[in-house]
Amino acid sequence: MKKRKVGIPRALLYYYYFPFWLKLFSELNLEPVISDSTSRDLLNKGVKKSLSEICVPIKVMIGHVLNLDQKDVDYIFMPRFRSLKKDVVLCPKFLGLPDMIRHSLPGLKTEVIADQIDSKSDDIAQFSNHQKLAETFSITKREMKSALKKATDFWQRYRDLLFKGYLIDDFAGIEELEILEKVITKFENDPKPPQSRDQNLEAPVNEEVVDIAVIGYVYNIFDQYINMDIINKLKEMGVRVHSFSMVAEETIEKELSNLRKPMFWEFTNKLYGAAEHYLKNDGIDGVIHLTAFGCGPDSMLGQILEVDAKEYEKTFMTLRIDEQTGESHIITRIEAFIDLMRLKKENN
Amino acid sequence: MNNLYLGVDIGSVSINIVAIDEENELVFKLYTRNSGNPIELVKEGLAKLREEIELENYKISGVGVTGSGRQLIAYVLGADTVKNEITAHARASTYYHPEAGTIFEIGGQDSKLIIVEDGIAVDFAMNTVCAAGTGSFLDHQAERLGVPIEEFGGLALEADRDVRIAGRCTVFAESDMISKQQYGFTKPEIINGLSEALVRNYMNNLVRNRVLEGEYIFQGGVAANIGIKAAFEEEIGAEVIVPEHHDVMGAIGIAMLAKRDVKRSGQESSFRGFDLTEQEFETTSFECEDCANNCEVIKVIADSKVIAVTGDRCGKWTASLIGDSAANANVEGSSEKEEKTAAKSSKKQDEDLNKNSEELEANLYKVDLEKEKQVMKELEELEKSDENKKEDNSLV
């Protein structure tokens, strides 16, 4: 029998969970189809069909769903992430995402599978989170559970590499499970450290290497189109790039417990914990908060970080991205930011 | 033969060219309005430089370009250093004013705040998407009120009464000004209100909760406006210094940076020479249709020879200039660069670990019946507690 095709939008938490989904679908004998990388055309289509005041990551998501709708897939897989921790939810836009898609795209041909994800941790491999998927393809509970187990084990290997200092960017372009497996195995056995830990990194002529933590949601910092490829721009300028996904869960928890009242949103809390860790860390020269224009949760996070950066005397900058951001303004800002840190180092 | 370093600042409203010598003394200074053709203006500027100084005594040893239009002009000139205007401004003002603590810089298109400690810039802020409170807005309003921009600031000081004008947004500011005019406020009062609004806006958007310390330096094209300077002094309650060369500080700074870079690398300047004033430059653009990004690719042509290509996100057109063979290799990988490298690395590792990986895989996914059973049991238990959890959650 021909494998049925399930489309996965390359947007939002795709960057966090894609190894899990690739493995899961392969175990279930389904063919995952990933939407194209974000491009001008894809974003324009998304913007046209979105509410005008919604944030750009959601507009990107809508663009990706439209892209999949034209790819002749049997279903579109887009879970409703509700919670990954007790008493903490995700941003309301995640909670309402499937409804928003239904409302914004009444002409969508492809059926959407929208399981609700309610988990106690980042591990989302519970059967209850995949009931609709199982029903749609008449998968038995037993089969599903065994596939989920394998998927989560595979995802855990990916996560361990992230904790070791690899960037999601090092994997995110890969769509084939076989290639991903090989890359993961390779990195696991690689004696060479990842870029963020590389002490022998070479900066452009006569300049010093600096360490910068880029604090932002996975879908903002790893979507190369929407952020003007900031990660690679930083790398080219001789920067070791750090991100929240490298910080151990315990460290994040510990930092969070210092907050009198944690925020309501899962990934905002994660960013907070990681950012605090980096602000206190002497090995980090500066922190960039990369945020999408109009992001509600970040309006709180950004303020807290601004105040704390001053307290820890860490060089700090907020970069805002939106649908139409000229590349030159991003370059001007990151260049000036890096210059600040290099001057500081030179004078010490 | 003395060394001379050129600094060029291509702003949205003005184009500035300076030349400094080994001791950072200003040998040449030119401030021109950007009428829209930066290449021609730079050529004219260089021609003027050639007329004014005796070139036999000097050698151009370094060229730096800054400002929002820096990229294109850097290709035209063959610049050694291309850097953002924040670093350039900070460099120049900390040189002239080592005691500086706060630098206000307001240019044509954007405004900046630079915080300095012990002669080093430690923090900066730049206006976001909106152009309220920048030079071009003032230009526009001066034109609307029929006041030459040079007299604009002086008029503000003649105001008798205070008028409050909304400074948050240029559209609102303009409608506010019109209605206040209709109430009978005089031009000086309106202009004074506008200056105050501009400074208020600057404080709200850029300074925010930063603590400002002296000396206070005010530079950029707008610093020529004594009305704005007065409004700043009123707002912070201290004297504000406008440097002598406030209008070309960016150009001076980038010239100093070019000098540093050339010295560090020990290489000859890549300046294309004064002959470029006689060359014909042309820029053409086309929309690349090789992927869904449809980048606008810009070509810079000097005497019918392409000297630079820019604007492509993937870099394949930029690379096409370097050499045909290199270009061919790049064209293939253009839009899916990272995928290609991933595939490449996996291929490489294929060779290294071919046997190993198969073994590894086999081991990893070997089904151990005993273990499987136990895992399933564990999962089931988790499941149960999860289901209980779900009920709880529904009440949340």
Regions found by a protein language model. Give the residues of each.
Chain B
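Glycine-rich phosphate-binding/hydrolytic loop that grips phosphoryl groups
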Residues: R91, G135-D139, E244-F271
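Glycine-rich phosphate-binding loop plus the immediately following alpha-helix
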Residues: S35-I39, D118-R161, C169, R260, ...
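Adenine-nucleotide phosphate-binding core of ATP-dependent small-molecule kinases
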Residues: S175-N204
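Glycine-rich phosphate-binding loops at beta-strand->alpha-helix junctions
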Residues: T66-G69, A197, R208-E235, P243-G250
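Short glycine-rich, Thr/Ser-proximal phosphate-binding strand/loop in the N-terminal lobe
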Residues: L4-A47, F124, T128-V129
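Gly/Thr-rich phosphate-binding beta-strand-loop-beta motif of the actin/hexokinase/Hsp70
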Residues: N2-E23, A100-V116, C291, E296-V300
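Acidic, glycine/GT-rich loop-and beta-edge segments that sit at the periphery of enzyme/chaperone cores
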Residues: R260-V331, S335, D350-S357
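Short beta-strand-loop/turn "lid" adjacent to the catalytic site in phosphate-handling enzymes
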Residues: L30-S35, I53-I86, V122-D123
